[in-house]
Amino acid sequence: MGGKTLYDKLWDDHLVQQRDDGSALLYIDRHIVHEVTSPQAFEGLRLAKRKPWRVDSVVATPDHNVPTTQKERASGVEGIEDPTSRIQVQTLDSNCDELGILEFKINDARQGIVHVVGPETGACLPGMTIVCGDSHTSTNGALGALAMGIGTSEVEHVLATQCLVAKKMKSMLVKVDGKLGAGVTPKDVVLAIIGKIGTAGGTGYAIEFGGEVMRSMSMEGRLTVCNMAIEAGARAGMVAVDDITIDYVKGRSFAPKGEHWEQAVAAWRDLKSDDDAVFDAVVELRGEEILPQVSWGTSPEMVLPVDASIPDPELETDAVKQNGMRRALQYMGLKAGQAIKDIYVDRVFIGSCTNSRIEDIRAAAEVVKGRTKAASVKEAIVVPGSGAVKAQAEAEGLDKIFVEAGLEWREPGCSMCLAMNADKLGDGEHCASTSNRNFEGRQGYGGRTHLVSPAMAAAAAIAGHFVDVREF
């Protein structure tokens, strides 16, 4: 019998029951909850007269609907102007209060984006099964965990039973060897991966990211890569546990302490694929061939190096892809053959669960330091992913660097990643965004999103158009 992949080990460790129809019951260790996908789940529990099976496994925080300006945040929940958004946050508060669920409320210093708060507090740990009613839950797989997004009915089911009905996926290894060049970031790595395999390339798979580049990558970088596994079509992404993982987790609020820490580390050391493990698919990239990336279309797979030009749909032989390219160019207001560097931006967004951690903030600050935002850029906002990130950045004086350069420093939240709060694009506006999705209308009706790294977004804010940050 061959060895096991990391995914095999995590699956087997949490398998409660294998069913004849191919589905299985998985035990869930950690359930992260936010205000958008939980109200109906809590109401379902209430109607069925059920209580959460393990209250101590649930951690909640509002993020999608929260305002990011200091003025609105000063009034707490009441400061949320949109009535629907306000009700969703209030409902989360009341449900958590009623059931005794730990919640980092809107003005709690620990509040933030669920996928930032989970790892940084130690609520999400290696070896866990982790679910949240949000597709980017895959982020937490960077810890050596099995982390998946679930729907609202599944949120209710996990609350009630501590189990999830799921079918085992196939396993894919995405191996990135070699070394990254200067100015090339984890965001560029994952965009390059998606550009290679497409947004359906990982469908039906759990992706393990490996190779020299991943082994040398910081934990925050790994979180960025696993965050966008879903954009490659995979429900889960993960990275094997190593010293970088353990050093990151040690000392965090919810991490084991003392003797329990030593026991945990001993167990976590096995959270890696065996040398003789066989994957269902293997994809290989070379780190030195990856350049700073910019998305040009309305799907994350429509991405190119910054020094490239927009492709011509007429040269595409696949009719479906050709039609998709034509529609994307029309929506984005771009032309085939146009240089990426000739795309001007109206707004810049540095934040989201993909790129709002302290390393991301530092990278952006390094680019804008001593420079001034281009007058043609209407707005450039920097939104830390959590209260902890915000406090750390301010302790380092990074907020002042942004403000002096003409960028806005905001409060934690999902912000302009999606049009569910006050931070939105106007119709036809182009945005250099460090988020994860560039779908039509994702950042606002008619908004045109270009996915980039924090450093590339910061450079665009200064230049007013896309530039190669390596030459900036």
From Swiss-Prot:
It catalyses: (2R,3S)-3-isopropylmalate = (2S)-2-isopropylmalate. [4Fe-4S] cluster binds at C353, C414, C417. Pathway: Amino-acid biosynthesis; L-leucine biosynthesis; L-leucine from 3-methyl-2-oxobutanoate: step 2/4. Binds 1 [4Fe-4S] cluster per subunit. Belongs to the aconitase/IPM isomerase family. LeuC type 1 subfamily. NCBIfam families: leuC, PRK05478.1, PRK12466.1. PANTHER family: 3-ISOPROPYLMALATE DEHYDRATASE, HOMOACONITASE, MITOCHONDRIAL-RELATED. This is 3-isopropylmalate dehydratase large subunit. It comes from Saccharophagus degradans (strain 2-40 / ATCC 43961 / DSM 17024).
